[in-house]
Amino acid sequence: MSTKISSTLSIWTFGIGPAGTGKTYLAMAMALKELIAGNVERIILTRPAVEAGEALGFLPGELQEKILPYLTPLYDAMNDMMGKEQTMQLVERGIVEIAPLAYMRGRTLANAFVVLDEAQNTTHEQMMMFLTRLGDGSRMVITGDITQIDLPRAKQSGLKEATRLLKDINGLQLFHFDGQ
């Protein structure tokens, strides 16, 4: 499946499936492949700050320190592929950027490979805002598990809505992962 996805990478690629199917790992592999090939200048990692317990603002530390625990699966994948030292060098040089979804409004993400992980926890408004951040020379991979939505019951998942509304859009690919 990885070869098929990598060789047919679209502007927007959605990877949807249950936990443990490799969505996050493949997204990072695709991002690093594009970076190493010189097709993008940077990798931007984001996800919604939604959880069952404390809110992001109540965690100690600066913004980057607060968002880091949410992005651990992405860092784990990078560490596995490149080693921790090289991963940290890319972060320190700004080639890999942590960007909280809440602060994306107004940005244009050009020449970047953008990974939105855990997208099932975006609202409709967050997803539409995110999808419109794409700038020249960029690609987005959006991953999520629609069986693990942690939004309040009154909110609909932006991932579910986006895939339903955009499934026939040119330049968008939708991959469904399963446990097999």
Enumerate the predicted regions with their spans.
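Conserved helicase motor core of SF1/SF2 NTP-dependent helicases
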Residues: 2, 11-116, 120-180
